[in-house]
Amino acid sequence: EGSETVILTLSSPSNATLGSDNVHTFTILEPVGDRNISFADATSSGAESSSSKAIAINLSATSGQNVTVNYAVTGTATGSGTDYTLANGTATIPAGSTSTTITIGSIINDSLDEVDETVVITLSNPSNADAGSILVHTYTINDNDNAPVIDFNETSSSGAESVSSKPLTVDLSAASGQDVTVNYAVTGTATGSGTDYSLANGTLTISAGATSGTIDISSIIDDSIDETNETVIVTLSSPSNATLGSDSVHTYTITDNDNPPVIDF
């Protein structure tokens, strides 16, 4: 209940005159320490396909007055409708009640493969109650999207040795919310390290939000030697944040463009 009053009023004195201060009010204050406010739980989680989540706040005992508490919203997820909707605010438990909820609304079910994200709600500055033991609640939005598939957009190509470079396109089946990496190894009948071309073993990174990247065979040498066509074979392996597709090997053929020599006595 709220604070209560006892009012004493003097009247009808005998052998005296009633003064101006003839009323006294005594206030019985309700002890705030009789109840505290806190979250029902410190953590919870749900798939991003869940459109909303109600987070319970409990009061240990009823009050004759409204109990309010401020809350601030942080976490790795982005609010304002990007991942969810919930702004900083004030929660109210009406007089006579022992609970209320803060609702995380408009949780977005996107198509991006991404890490699980959090919404962290922190209570502060309660009125008509003391702060309880659980003042921070972390809600985890669990991603429900499969990792994209990564592979070459074609398994073979060719070009004359007069073509100085060749970009090989690596595709993702869908954009990802995370950077995607994939290792590649270079083999074939052509000789690297600047003899026929330049390309060493390495790692390709496709940035979050992008759907493709390129591996460049560069410094292709246009020599004057008549020779067989030569190959540069690039093999993808060990992707992170993606699944390796079936077209994981690309063979680029360097086509010789020199005439055979003339032989005579």
Model regions: which residues?
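Short boundary segments that mark the start of a structured unit
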Residues: 1-265
